[in-house]
UniProtKB/Swiss-Prot annotation:
Protein name according to UniProt: tRNA pseudouridine synthase A
Catalytic activity: uridine(38/39/40) in tRNA = pseudouridine(38/39/40) in tRNA
One GO molecular-function entry: RNA binding
Residues forming the catalytic site: 54
Disulfide pattern: none
Binding site for substrate: 111
Function according to Swiss-Prot or TrEMBL: Formation of pseudouridine at positions 38, 39 and 40 in the anticodon stem and loop of transfer RNAs.
Matches recorded under Gene3D superfamilies: Pseudouridine synthase I, catalytic domain, C-terminal subdomain (3.30.70.660), Pseudouridine synthase I, catalytic domain, N-terminal subdomain (3.30.70.580)
Oligomer and partners: Homodimer.
Keywords: Isomerase, tRNA processing
Enzyme class, UniProt record, top EC level: isomerase
Alphabetized Pfam families for the sequence: PseudoU_synth_1
Native organism: Mycoplasma capricolum subsp. capricolum (strain California kid / ATCC 27343 / NCTC 10154)
E.C. no: 5.4.99.12
Length: 249
């Protein structure tokens, strides 16, 4: 009997090479699968993540469809898996779903990027980017990010190589971007149904450089959003990026 279980997962991505199974690196999915296998004593199961987080990216609300071939007592089953997991990965909750549930059919995903422009903090540095310049004017920065809201050509703001452009839908819609100040930290919040590889981090790096008037400006970004020009080498560190929420249709 095929059983579907929807897991809500949180993890500190610092020690992992992203979500997806890797041949030569340790990923979050690899470690989760290892814990599940230890509990059920078989390899006959499947996990599918709703979001393919990159290396060193964290998650507070990753959704994972687990397909197994028996019906467990759910609370005991999840407790056993959590016991087998390392401390930097945790299943927050779980529920039974149709095994054919489409984990990729989301209404929206929210990613937050955290920037510390106040005072260096060794205890939070693992989860934020430390800004070495003067305090960020969030209204000025918001104006730059507003360029990216809506439907645009994002191929120049992606980690895709030029020979990959035809294989991906690079014209995408970003529903909203908010620049917030919360507890002396700047939080840049992205909302969309999905993102291209490295898209958020490349957009942030370019916007911050435009804010500083360093090598790119509003005109440059506007042209790039039309697919005009070439990619810049700018990409911000992954450690400040957190998968904050996934909402299904």
């Amino acid at each position: 009997m095929k059983t579907g279980i929807l897991l809500t997962l949180c993890y500190d991505g610092s020690n992992y090479h992203g979500w997806i199974n890797q041949t030569n690196s340790i990923s979050t999915q690899t470690v989760l699968n290892k814990a599940i296998k230890k509990v059920i004593k078989t390899s006959e199961f499947k996990t599918i993540g709703a979001s393919k987080t990159d290396a060193n990216v964290h998650a507070l609300d990753q959704k994972v469809l687990l397909i197994i071939y028996f019906t467990p007592i759910l609370e005991k089953f999840i407790n056993a898996i959590n016991k087998a997991l390392p401390e930097d990965i945790r299943i927050l909750n779980a529920k039974f779903v149709d095994p054919n549930f489409n984990i990729r059919e989301v209404d929206y995903k929210i990613y937050n990027y955290y920037i510390n422009d106040h005072k260096f903090d060794i205890f939070t540095n693992r989860y934020e980017y430390f800004w070495k310049h003067s305090k960020i004017d969030i209204l000025k920065l918001q104006e730059i990010f507003n360029l990216f809201i809506g439907e645009h050509e994002f191929k120049l703001f992606s980690g895709l190589k030029e020979n990959e452009w035809d294989n991906y839908q690079t014209k995408r819609i970003i529903d909203d971007i908010k620049v917030l100040r919360i507890n002396n930290k700047v939080v840049i919040q992205f909302k969309a149904t999905g993102f291209i590889r490295y898209q958020i981090r490349i957009i942030i790096a370019n916007c911050l450089n435009a804010y500083l008037n360093y090598k790119v400006n509003i005109n440059t970004l506007t042209e790039m959003l039309q697919g005009i020009g070439k990619k810049t080498p700018f990409i911000i560190k992954a450690k400040g990026l957190v998968l904050q929420e996934i909402k299904f249709k």
